[in-house]
């Protein structure tokens, strides 16, 4: 009798898991993105975050709800649609945000770090930050909504600080960021979640810097890419079939590409080079 009861319970659990997976598959269609306007989308994403043990989940949704609560005002927010249709009006998004806020919100790097904070290990060798983190640090130090992240600002600085390449051959630029992370004993303790970094080259100042960052979650049959586009710009999740789809996603964003003298950009998963634009 006990054996029959145990089998019955297992069957119920399996059916429940299958229903959850079916619901997720219906929502997460490959090639589609969302700004998480609907509560159903947010609740499903929260489940994914909890399953993968991401950090600061409540805080993330507080930031998200705060950004999404106003009328669109020409920013370009929407529910699920094909990823290549997500084109934002930067000025309208900023005006929309600043209508009710006196301090800037976080950006891509702050959001990515917040979600990964408890599963990242990194030695804090550097204590000073450069020009390219100036606005990030202003938010962390002056906006109370980001106090939790600011309490660990040395980890944040060491993860995203700029890199001088004045004395490095251009052919070696692609190795600078992963070598930096390795020198800091960087480790991300998950086999399903990873940090995606877009490293850009400022040829005027011989500098490499992390121009964009996001979180990639492996859902077994697809990937979910979670990002905040920029300061005072939307949050976006995108469903992709493979990591190669990230290359196409970033390729459509002209702001990541400098003049002809600039190398890259370089796309990394944690400390591994995924792609070098040439």
Describe these PLM feature segments.
Residues 15-278:
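Cysteine-nucleophile amide-bond enzymes
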Residues 4-13:
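Sec-dependent N-terminal signal peptides
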């Amino acid at each position: 009798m006990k054996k029959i009861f145990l089998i019955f319970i297992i069957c119920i659990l399996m059916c429940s898991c299958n229903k959850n997976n079916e619901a997720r598959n219906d929502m997460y269609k490959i090639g589609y993105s969302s700004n998480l306007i609907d509560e159903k989308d947010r609740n499903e994403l929260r489940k994914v975050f909890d399953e993968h043990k991401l950090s600061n989940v409540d805080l993330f949704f507080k930031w998200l709800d705060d950004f999404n609560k106003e009328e669109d005002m020409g920013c370009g927010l929407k529910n699920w649609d094909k990823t290549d249709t997500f084109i934002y009006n930067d000025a309208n998004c900023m005006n929309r945000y600043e209508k009710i806020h006196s301090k800037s919100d976080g950006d891509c790097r702050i959001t990515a770090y917040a979600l990964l904070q408890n599963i990242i290990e990194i030695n804090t060798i550097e204590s000073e930050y450069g020009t390219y983190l100036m606005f990030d640090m202003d938010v962390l130090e002056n906006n109370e909504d980001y106090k939790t992240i600011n309490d660990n600002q040395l980890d944040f600085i060491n993860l995203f600080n700029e890199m001088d390449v004045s004395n490095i051959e251009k052919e070696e630029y692609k190795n600078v960021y992963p070598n930096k992370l390795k020198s800091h004993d960087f480790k991300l303790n998950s086999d399903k979640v990873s940090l995606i970094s877009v490293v850009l080259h400022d040829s005027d100042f011989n500098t490499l810097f992390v121009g964009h960052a996001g979180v990639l979650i492996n859902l077994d049959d697809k990937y979910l890419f979670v990002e905040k586009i920029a300061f005072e710009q939307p949050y976006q999740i995108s469903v992709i079939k493979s990591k190669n789809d990230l290359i196409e996603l970033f390729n459509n964003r002209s702001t990541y590409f400098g003049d002809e003298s600039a190398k890259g950009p370089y796309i990394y998963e944690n400390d591994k080079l995924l792609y070098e634009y040439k």
